């Protein structure tokens, strides 16, 4: 079983999604302002996700605020590339989790 898991890990590291993410991350490293903006964006996303998980409905103002922040961030091409690569890698990993969850018929919250 562990050999298969290691094979999957190697395949993920060889995927275009992972390679693109690594390349985009390298462009961001050493740019403190870009790193901070991305961290602030992620923090705001997580705060809003936490509210949703608590059963609260986001206001239009909250949604628009996050969208405005995102639109400011993507003006920097390196940040835009990073966020897009991060999203593609996240989708790939989510798909893999879903496939595994369905294969073993376990209802895990992150496979939905």
UniProtKB/Swiss-Prot annotation:
Matching SUPFAM superfamilies: YheA/YmcA-like
Family of this protein: Belongs to the UPF0342 family.
Intrachain S-S bonds: none
Signal peptide: none
Any Pfam family matching the protein: Com_YlbF
Protein name per Swiss-Prot or TrEMBL: UPF0342 protein STH1710
């Amino acid at each position: 079983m562990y050999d298969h898991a290691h094979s999957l890990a190697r395949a993920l590291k060889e995927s275009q999604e992972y390679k693109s993410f690594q390349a985009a991350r390298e462009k961001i490293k050493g740019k403190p302002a870009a790193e901070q903006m991305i961290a602030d964006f992620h923090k705001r996303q997580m705060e809003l996700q936490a509210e949703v998980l608590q059963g609260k409905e986001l206001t239009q103002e909250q949604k628009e605020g996050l969208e405005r922040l995102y639109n400011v961030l993507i003006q920097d091409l390196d940040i835009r590339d990073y966020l897009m690569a991060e999203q593609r890698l996240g989708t790939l990993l989510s798909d893999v989790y879903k496939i595994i969850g369905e294969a073993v018929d376990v209802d895990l919250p992150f496979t939905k």
